Design a protein with these regions (language model features):
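Interdomain hinge/linker elements that couple catalytic modules in large macromolecular machines
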Residues: 2, 154-235
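Pre-Walker A adenine-sensing motif
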Residues: 2-19
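Hydrophobic anchor at the beta1->P-loop junction of P-loop NTPases
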Residues: 24
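P-loop (Walker A) phosphate-binding loop of NTP-binding proteins
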Residues: 27
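Conserved lysine of the Walker
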Residues: 32-33
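Short glycine-rich substrate-engagement loop in P-loop NTPases that contacts/grips substrate
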Residues: 55-86
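Conserved Walker B catalytic segment
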Residues: 91, 95-129
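Short regulatory helix/loop adjacent to the ATP-binding pocket of P-loop NTPases
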Residues: 135-151, 167-168
């Protein structure tokens, strides 16, 4: 299943080679990686960019654990930038994996990764795109950390138009009922039963969003979040 996200793809295209770090943010599992590694990379290749000039690195993959160290990441990227006459497109996914726990926990501790990315931006022939989705990747934080060199593209879950385009054989009313019930996270479309959709969303909320909230606001007692959630959901 291939979902078109033309609205966001066009935003990346418009920002191409603008001298800033394109930062793709958004809630977990809303399609940031797919947009960057599939749709945008495909666009680049279709418009004449050679494979060797696209440096893609998913930092959530344990095979790339070494490059979660910002210094190693910098060395890795720079090792590919050899042809001064060509533009290199650096696509880094889930950059929060290159931010240490201490940097995440303490807002007063500078994030080394941001210095590395700012340093890479000094190379005259690179165009940088990154994705991230945790509490250190809020738009206001990014603009502060990148010192005016960040250009944020905020991704949202699927609109109903995007959602319905993937609902082959389903009438629009039924599709909207599903959309209104389960929302527009792309992976929901791959779940075949109501039970599977509910379980996916429940697991995502418990394992991901709770953790981000606790991390962002340094909440040690998870019962506080449970109680707040109950109040909001019953309102």
């Amino acid at each position: 299943m291939r979902i078109k996200r033309d609205r966001y793809l066009n935003q990346l295209i418009e920002r191409r080679n603008n001298g800033l770090i394109k930062v793709i943010t958004g809630i977990r599992r809303c399609g940031k990686s797919f947009l960057l590694f599939e749709l945008f990379a495909e666009y680049l290749k279709e418009n004449g960019v050679k494979d060797e000039h696209i440096i893609s690195l998913p930092l959530d993959d344990d095979i790339n654990e070494k490059y979660r160290d910002p210094h190693e990441l910098s060395l890795y990227v720079r090792s590919f930038v050899k042809d001064s006459s060509a533009t290199y497109y650096i696509l880094l996914d889930e950059i929060q994996f290159a931010i240490s726990r201490e940097e995440l926990k303490n807002p007063d501790v500078p994030v080394r990764l941001y210095s590395v990315l700012n340093g890479l931006l000094h190379l005259p022939n690179v165009d940088i795109y990154v994705t991230g989705s945790n509490s250190k990747m809020l738009s206001k934080d990014i603009m502060t950390e990148f010192r005016g060199r960040g250009d944020v593209v905020e991704i949202h879950p699927l609109t109903f138009q995007e959602y319905y385009a993937c609902c082959a054989g389903m009438d629009k009313i039924s599709a909207f009922e599903d959309y209104a019930t389960y929302g527009g996270l792309p992976l929901v479309l791959s779940k075949k039963t109501d039970t599977a959709k509910i379980q996916y969303l429940k697991n995502l909320f418990q394992e991901v969003y709770y953790k981000d909230i606790q991390e962002r606001y340094q909440i040690e007692d998870s019962d506080v979040i449970d109680e707040m959630t109950d109040v909001l959901c019953s309102a």
